[in-house]
Amino acid sequence: IISNRQEQLTKLDELIKARFVEMFGDLVENPKQFPCMLLGSIMTVMPQNGLYKPQSAYVQDKFGTPILRIDGFYNGKVTDFNNLKRLCCTDFEKERYLLVENDIVINRVNSIEYLGKCARISGLQEDTVFESNMMRFHLDDSKVNSTYITTVLCSQYIYRQILTRAKKAVNQASINQGDVQSLNVVVPPLSLQNQFADFVAEVDKSKLLVGSAVAHKPFDIEFFFKSTVQRPIKEV
């Protein structure tokens, strides 16, 4: 049952990738000739490094402030806000490092294969801060959709750009705030970005159904494919 569930989740992720290519094409070739912009030009909050606290500041109870760490997100999404580590923060630290909905966080120092790992913040349940080996920024939602941009940032197209900017040291590499602002991103019309984000939201709902299908009836991935993936894209 678990193997079948994982297989369905993998197929749903593949549907997102296929839909992205169908709507926007290969980002390197940009066959639809969408404009390219510097990531910094579509930000409303510039990249900011996160909070460093010694291990002694971390607490085992539920009374501290949750902190997002690198192991807390995967493939553009926070894995589980309920399982974040907690620590003691001052009011000033909370105000300065507080995450808000639709922020994007990106790994700034790590082994080279994980450098640039990122996630969109969605579904915050309480005040949450972010740690020092990542940066946080916020996008102009009148120009771009954060779900679309996060998908772009998770692509090989961006990872190759990060590799050219990375400062390499023994066992790790780093990027700085200027490097992130200088990344080139393909920016289609906002209406198309929003269509893609709506599709991702539908897939995410289906992932929840897959998770609950073990105790109930199996999730019908073929029906989902016919009802959503085969829906025509609205031209702009």
Walk through the language-model features, giving the residues of each.
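Sequence-specific dsDNA recognition surfaces
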Residues: 40-58, 71-104
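Carboxylate-rich, polar loop motifs that coordinate divalent cations or form catalytic acidic clusters
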Residues: 65
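Periplasmic-binding protein-like
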Residues: 158-163
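A short beta-sheet element
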Residues: 69, 94-154
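A short glycine-rich beta-alpha junction/loop motif
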Residues: 126-135, 144, 167-194
